[in-house]
């Protein structure tokens, strides 16, 4: 079972204005967690750090007891983490199936259908789907990657 942990992580966009200060916790794969807080409290920033998109100002992010802040965030992101972004990051001229196959060679149709997309919707470009349908495509893409951690 994989673990993703923060140890005394801090981050600030401007010097002296810390968004995250001394954050420590541990997540185990196979479990679901929620990060809650008001707007501007650092939830998205924390997910960016966990996903290897940014580096903490201090502290460590560990994946299976390996300090990924020292060993390579890009490798960690590519091999162990799947991110579902707020803006979905879909290729709008591609279909849901094509978008899902960008991360995996698995048969995307059952995953997309399990998330409620119809045969007709699978043939449309994602630009022609509703926001909720696009979100389901982004979720399907993360599930298809089979990463131990989805953020």
Language model region names:
Residues 51:
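Helix-to-loop junction immediately C-terminal to a conserved catalytic motif
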Residues 125-129, 133-135:
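Conserved ABC ATPase signature
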Residues 111-127:
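Conserved ABC nucleotide-binding domain
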Residues 59-67:
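Conserved ABC transporter NBD signature motif
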Residues 67-82:
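ABC ATPase NBD coupling module
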């Amino acid at each position: 079972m994989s673990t993703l942990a923060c140890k005394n992580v801090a981050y600030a966009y401007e010097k002296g204005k810390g968004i995250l200060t001394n954050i420590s916790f541990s997540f185990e794969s196979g479990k679901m967690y929620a990060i809650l807080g008001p707007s501007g409290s650092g939830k998205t920033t924390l997910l960016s750090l966990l996903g290897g998109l940014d580096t903490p100002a201090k502290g460590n992010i560990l994946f299976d007891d390996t300090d990924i802040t020292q060993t390579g965030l890009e490798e960690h992101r590519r091999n162990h983490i799947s991110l579902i972004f707020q803006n979905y990051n879909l290729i709008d001229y591609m279909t849901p199936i094509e978008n899902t196959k960008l991360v995996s060679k698995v048969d995307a149709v059952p995953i997309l259908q399990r998330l409620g997309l119809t045969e007709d919707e699978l043939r449309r470009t994602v630009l022609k789907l509703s926001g909720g349908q696009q979100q389901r495509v982004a979720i399907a893409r993360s599930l298809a990657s089979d990463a131990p951690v989805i953020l």
